């Protein structure tokens, strides 16, 4: 049954002109920050790249620069993971992972220990590791089924895991291994720790372009039924995932993003950011240079200017 949403008319908004203006105005930030170097495979990425793509619910696409260049989406993939888990487990998923902002670093152990192994939300590392464990239980062929879901979202069957990145993360992912062991200690993981970690790292290693991400996240704008490769969500569930993105999607900088941009979204240490304007558009931006909180400097500024110049946010 088709969800009854009115599709907003974006014909009177010159998004391409706005994107070009934004690109000119963020140039002073082009040499600030650096790419993630604690993941060796990501440290090799040319930091002087930038792409942006905006896809509207009425079928228009606006992009510039490196919008077709694929990169490691890292934590952006956690939105896909929790969507799949919510489809498969329903509201029971929230017994295993919370919906609250963490207020701490995305790889913090302290809060997890204090709260007996129940992660604050599905977008910090501990929460995403729990979700990966659940998907290992619920999917018949976890790796194949999950990537099929992502491919269905973006409409491109060539999207895939990057095994070099996943292996690199596992080799040096000591803190994530500590998180997984703490989760296991508290009885929050059912599967073998190594199996969970490798699946988690593979999920994070998925490579997509801004163009593919903006198309994939149109599914979360609520303009049509959410049904992709056997993963189905109703309109209420999609809205609630947007709410969690709004409050928890940017590590311990979620409040700043809400204040400056005013859209639900998710970032990743690969330099990507995706944001959603429900019923209107989704937008993906990529620039590998990060701020100390792990978010793309040029990406954050670009999205701040986007909602400023369009005068469109959810508030």
Regions found by a protein language model. Give the residues of each.
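Penicillin-binding protein/beta-lactamase superfamily catalytic region
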Residues: 140, 170, 179-240, 293-296
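Structured C-terminal helix/loop/strand segments within mature extracytoplasmic catalytic/sensor domains
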Residues: 23, 223-315
